[in-house]
Design a protein with these regions (language model features):
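Charged, alpha-helix-enriched surfaces in structured cytosolic catalytic cores
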Residues: 1-4, 30, 45-49, 83
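Catalytic donor-sugar/metal-binding loop of nucleotide-sugar-dependent glycosyltransferases
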Residues: 42, 52-69
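Acceptor/aglycone-binding surface of glycosyltransferases and processive sugar-polymer synthases
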Residues: 1-34
Length: 159
C-alpha cells in the first residue's frame, strides 16, 4: 500500500513529505493538542491524513521519525487492498479540496476475481467518512480525560 498508493500521492501532491519512510506504518504518535483539532477519517486514511494535516499546520519539521527496528506486519489478502486504497485516496482528496462533506461517505468499489471461464464481480461498500475535530464536539472540553479502564482510586489497570 505504501509503495503503490501513499508514496506516489506524496510525490505528486506533498513532496515536502517524501522523506517519510513509512507513511502508513500503523505506528505513530501525535500530541493531543494537535490531533483534537483534526478531522479524522475512518479506516485506513487516518495515518496519511494526520501526516498531511500536521505538515499543513506545523510544517514538515514538526514530523520526526524513529527506527523501531524490524516489524513484521500481517499481509492483507489481495482483495482487501482495494478498499484500503480507496480510504487513503479519499482522505487525500479531502485535503486537496477535491472531496467535501457533501460527497458520498460510502463508495461502491467494484472488484473482479478470476473464476473458471471469466471473472466474478464483487461490490464492496467502502466507508470514507470523516469524524469532526474533537474540539468541535459539544461537551468535549468538559469531558474527563481519564479513560474508563483506569481505576479512579489507584490509577491502576482494570483490564
Amino acid at each position: 500500500m505504501t509503495e503503490l498508493v501513499a508514496r506516489p500521492i506524496l510525490a505528486l501532491h506533498f513532496p515536502e513529505l517524501a522523506h517519510v519512510v513509512q507513511p502508513l506504518s500503523g505506528e505513530w504518535a501525535i500530541r493531543r493538542v494537535a490531533f483534537e483539532r483534526m478531522s479524522v477519517p475512518v479506516g485506513y486514511g487516518v495515518e496519511i491524513a494526520a501526516l498531511v494535516d500536521t505538515c499543513a499546520v506545523h510544517g514538515p519539521d514538526a514530523i520526526a521519525q524513529v527506527d523501531l527496528g524490524r516489524r513484521t506486519h500481517r499481509h492483507h489478502r489481495h482483495d482487501t487492498l482495494g478498499p484500503m486504497a480507496v480510504q487513503v485516496l479519499a482522505a487525500v482528496e479531502r485535503r486537496l479540496g477535491e472531496r467535501t462533506d457533501g460527497d458520498a461517505v460510502v463508495i461502491p468499489l467494484r472488484q473482479f476475481a478470476p473464476v473458471s471461464g471469466g471473472f466474478e464481480e464483487a461490490v464492496r461498500h467502502v466507508d470514507v467518512a470523516e469524524r469532526p475535530p474533537a474540539v468541535d464536539i459539544r461537551g468535549y472540553r468538559s469531558a474527563s480525560f481519564v479513560p474508563d479502564w483506569i481505576d479512579e482510586d489507584d490509577r491502576g489497570w482494570r483490564r
